[in-house]
């Protein structure tokens, strides 16, 4: 079992501090914020192992966290401003567990996790938790051949000031060593059933955008 603590400072970049507006697209401008302050970040972590079971827990507290999102551009309703702001306080918690075992040629690892941020911004709460689960399978075949099949799931959740959509994905890979391990042949398929999407629903004040 191990317990860790980390303190760090995240400073805004010159581009984020620059008091100017730059063109991104017909509907998005990037706007600097010279009033940004450095963020102070405290992290606490715990890792414990019980045989083949591994458990992890993390907590984070931050003052003046730097967060980039979309906001209405003053006097132009049809244009969004991509801007970095300071959140006065930011807190998050996460817990996870992983268990791996071997059954003949099959070597699966099952993982599950929970994470939640706690953000209040302009009267709204952005604290919908994220649940993740995965089953990572490896099958060892003769003649240095390996088959991998990973099944991944994540729930609808808040990510900063955004809503991340529910996701499900299956990835497969076949790997074979050739010429006495001098060469390696890999055949892989990502998102086998075409179910994955990285779309986010961005909601800041009165702005809703894909």
Predicted regions: what is each one?
Residues 2-4, 54-56, 107-109, 146, ...:
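Membrane-spanning beta-strand positions in outer-membrane beta-barrel proteins
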Residues 61-63, 79-82, 86-152:
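Gram-negative outer-membrane beta-barrel transporters
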